[in-house]
Swiss-Prot record:
Chain positions recorded as Mg(2+) binding sites: 9, 58
Organism, as annotated: Shewanella frigidimarina (strain NCIMB 400)
Function comment: Transfers the 4'-phosphopantetheine moiety from coenzyme A to a Ser of acyl-carrier-protein.
GO CC aspect terms: cytoplasm
Database matches in NCBIfam families: acpS, pantethn_trn
Protein name, UniProt field: Holo-[acyl-carrier-protein] synthase
Family label: Belongs to the P-Pant transferase superfamily. AcpS family.
Gene field: acpS
Keywords noted in UniProt: Cytoplasm, Fatty acid biosynthesis, Fatty acid metabolism, Lipid biosynthesis, Lipid metabolism, Magnesium, Metal-binding, Transferase
Length: 126
């Protein structure tokens, strides 16, 4: 097994809060898949949830070497948690096609947040 991609992103949570105040849930609907959106809507801290998912998806897109665009959208990257609460990343559509081009088999993700920031790192392996 070899590393075929790595990406990191950091998001200022206040920026997400400002976007949410101005645009309501438009950003969330653009970034989150349906299951993620359902979790977001029930979250006690929706801005923090969205900031972490945004950072995670940007990190995943960077690991793919495309960023968001060039055939990869936010909707092609799904972040959820396993039974122990650890985050996991799954790829579909254009993101999955790009992962396969890289001969990637699996993505590992770490997400963290503190008062002002959310950060995520994704490592792709063959």
């Amino acid at each position: 097994m070899a590393i075929v991609g790595i990406g990191t992103d950091i998001v200022e949570i206040a920026r997400i809060s400002e976007q949410r105040e101005r645009l309501g849930d438009r950003l969330a609907r653009r970034v989150l898949t349906e299951p993620e959106l359902a979790t977001y809507m029930q979250s006690k801290q929706p801005e923090r949830f969205l900031a972490k998912r945004f950072a995670a998806k940007e990190a995943a897109a960077k690991a793919l070497g495309t960023g968001i665009g060039r055939g990869v959208s936010f909707q092609h990257i799904h972040i959820d948690n396993d039974a122990n609460g650890a985050p996991q990343v799954r790829f579909t559509d254009g993101a999955l096609a790009r992962l396969e081009q890289l001969a990637g088999k699996h993505g590992f993700i770490s997400i963290a947040d503190e008062k002002h920031y959310a950060v995520a790192t994704v490592v792709l392996e063959s």
